[in-house]
């Protein structure tokens, strides 16, 4: 799964996205509703309002602020992930699979290793071996006036499967652009996701 990620203090490209979207009318709307979008680098948790890239109504690529997690009628806990293997079949994700895809910029994602009793242990930051922005595949929907997203996950690559059996779908920059466009096959693009990861102990 993916329940935390990081925007690093030196990741200027993402920090510029944050500055840009905090000047928009959407940011004002969030603040009027008592929701504070992030304004700086740090660890990102569910319910945070963060940058995400998607198409606008004209089909143009834009950076938006979105809340991490879908509200659920039957549970207080937010739905934060979608399995790529089954998303097209699930009613909650079916329309987003074909029409409402986004990518979320990150520096790393976070995972904990687990003992035999499935209790979380050491914390690690993880990213692909390639440099640059880590593009996490996502789906989004509107909840009233609030755009909300989930992060798409896949079976973990062998380099990190000893920590957890799931990991986010991470796309190369070109595939991130293809992912958000409605006329492309999301299954095919997800199948080209980055695999081999590098990790560091984070405390």
Write out the residue ranges for each language-model feature.
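Short linear sequence motif anchored by a di-proline
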Residues: 1-203
């Amino acid at each position: 799964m993916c329940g935390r990620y990081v925007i690093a203090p030196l990741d200027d490209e993402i920090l510029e996205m944050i500055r840009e979207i905090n000047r928009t009318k959407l940011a004002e709307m969030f603040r009027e509703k008592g929701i504070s979008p992030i304004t700086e680098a740090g660890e990102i948790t569910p319910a945070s309002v963060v940058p995400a890239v998607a198409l606008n109504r004209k089909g143009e690529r834009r950076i938006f602020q979105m809340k991490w997690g879908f509200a659920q009628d039957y549970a207080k806990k937010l739905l934060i992930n979608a399995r790529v293997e089954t998303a097209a079949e699930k009613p909650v994700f079916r329309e987003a699979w074909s029409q409402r895809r986004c990518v979320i910029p990150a520096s790393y994602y976070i995972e904990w290793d687990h003992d035999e009793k499935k209790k979380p242990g050491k914390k690690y930051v993880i990213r692909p071996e390639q440099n640059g922005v880590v593009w996490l595949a996502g789906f989004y929907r509107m909840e009233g006036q609030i755009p909300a997203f989930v992060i798409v996950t896949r079976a973990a690559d062998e380099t990190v499967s000893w920590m957890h059996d799931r990991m986010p779908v991470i796309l190369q920059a070109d595939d991130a652009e293809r992912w958000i466009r409605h006329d492309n096959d999301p299954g095919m693009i997800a199948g080209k996701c980055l695999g081999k990861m590098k990790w560091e102990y984070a405390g």
